[in-house]
Amino acid sequence: MTGAGTPSQGKKNKTTHVKCRRCGEKSYHKQKKVCASCGFGKSAKRRDYAWQSKQGE
């Protein structure tokens, strides 16, 4: 059985996220084709949640 310890971390060398062409962040998932930051590829609207800012601001 393989663990998730220190020796396994050395195998993590593949690029998962690349630069998003809508927001410019390095959050666009190559396989899923969705941006984790702005929601590009999933929604025409920008990804935005109320918990991202203080209430009333």
Curated annotation (Swiss-Prot):
Entry's cofactor comment: Binds 1 zinc ion per subunit.
UniProt keyword Amino-acid biosynthesis present: no
Cofactor(s) recorded in Swiss-Prot or TrEMBL: Zn(2+)
PROSITE patterns, sorted: RIBOSOMAL_L37E (PS01077)
Role: Binds to the 23S rRNA.
Protein family according to the UniProt entry: Belongs to the eukaryotic ribosomal protein eL37 family.
Protein name, UniProt field: Large ribosomal subunit protein eL37
Species in which this protein is naturally found: Natronomonas pharaonis (strain ATCC 35678 / DSM 2160 / CIP 103997 / JCM 8858 / NBRC 14720 / NCIMB 2260 / Gabara) (Halobacterium pharaonis)
